[in-house]
Amino acid sequence: MADGKGKDESGKLLYCSFCGKNQNEVRKLIAGPSVYICDECVDLCNDIIREEVLEADAEGDEERLPAPREIRNTLDDYVIGQDRAKRVLSVAVYNHYKRLRADVKSEDVELGKSNILLIGPTGSGKTLLAETMARLLNVPFTIADATTLTEAGYVGEDVENIIQKLLQKCDYDVDKAQRGIVYIDEIDKISRKSDNPSITRDVSGEGVQQALLKLIEGTTASIPPQGGRKHPQQEFLQVDTSNMLFIVGGAFAGLEKVIRDRVEKGGIGFNAEVKSKDSEKAMGDILAGVEPEDLVKFGLIPEFVGRVPVIATLTELSEEALIQILTEPKNSLIKQYVHLFAMEGVELEFREDALRAVAHKAMARNTGARGLRSILESVLLDTMYEVPSLEDVTKVVIDASVITGDSEPLLIYSQQEESKVAGKDG
């Protein structure tokens, strides 16, 4: 190794053979046969090797495509219920990526792309299903809100912004982005105002559907590179969307009425089955019978409906399902809060009646699983504020009365405190 003064035995100043810095500008300079390398270049080489190893591992993971049953089992770890939707999604996603990996280019058989439409109430798990799927397959994933989109040239986000967000998620690696998953939420909010073609400009409804058509079907989008307007001289990135999987979702409030009207119209005449109001189907059962014509009647244009041939319906979560969501998934909310308290050395216990009270409250708010975290945050806020400053607290117990606001959480102190209390009681 060169000496600390930055000179060799002959007094000559030494330089890194890679970056050109002299020894006075770096911490270490390692000598080889007629060459030198500094500690900064060593770190850089390590980073390059580490990235290549990670990429090779990721490519190795991509080579093995999990079977539909494996995909379904992974979804079960994170999403409670929605069995039919999981099955539909597992098969659709498996076939999509099988199509990409097979790369069939035959004159006889061309495998088309099957994008997915998720229909279900707020908080039923639409976004979580798509997100979990992307994580399992190790592909880039982004979420877009259809209500913020407008036609190009109008105030709002262009549909190309969706692809830019996906590129950002994978550090502008175009090849990775082209195999990613895009979830567009609130798609029902861009339905046209009537089922007749619009003669006036509808920039946030039918216009957005038209703009999304090519993107979903497959087109080459020109996306500004990193920096965007700051570096206008840079060439635009060309991103092919034909291999991206698009999942669109929405609550579609009122769709059940459209379906019911169609079914009832089909049951008119002497042979019609007479149904009483008592025999009305549950909302989930009605939505499960959705047909493309119902979606067109609701306000989606026929061309858009044709681009999302796979339809999966999700049911509204019951109180029992919400209790399961609180405790059973791998990253359940209760497990998260238990871990947070454990980091303070405190055990957190939720009684069974407390879990039921939380689920009941979420049902009353009609927010599905999405409302569970806000309820727990509200209940635990003061405790999370106080506990880090309190000594000797070993356990916090939450029961139903805490959830309803009738009492405070029970704090249990260490054995010394408990013995003092026992002595006083004695």
From Swiss-Prot:
PANTHER family: ATP-DEPENDENT CLP PROTEASE ATP-BINDING SUBUNIT CLPX-LIKE, MITOCHONDRIAL, ATP-DEPENDENT CLP PROTEASE ATP-BINDING SUBUNIT CLPX-LIKE, MITOCHONDRIAL-RELATED
Binding, ATP: 121-128
Keywords: ATP-binding, Chaperone, Metal-binding, Nucleotide-binding, Zinc
Protein source organism: Chromohalobacter salexigens (strain ATCC BAA-138 / DSM 3043 / CIP 106854 / NCIMB 13768 / 1H11)
NCBIfam families listed in its UniProt record: clpX, PRK05342.1
Function: ATP-dependent specificity component of the Clp protease. It directs the protease to specific substrates. Can perform chaperone functions in the absence of ClpP.
Keyword Chaperone in annotation: yes
Subunit organization: Component of the ClpX-ClpP complex. Forms a hexameric ring that, in the presence of ATP, binds to fourteen ClpP subunits assembled into a disk-like structure with a central cavity, resembling the structure of eukaryotic proteasomes.
Domain named ClpX-type ZB: residues: 4-57
Record-given protein name: ATP-dependent Clp protease ATP-binding subunit ClpX
Domain of life: Bacteria
GO cellular component: HslUV protease complex
SUPFAM superfamilies: Glucocorticoid receptor-like (DNA-binding domain), P-loop containing nucleoside triphosphate hydrolases
Residues at which Zn(2+) binds: 16, 19, 38, 41
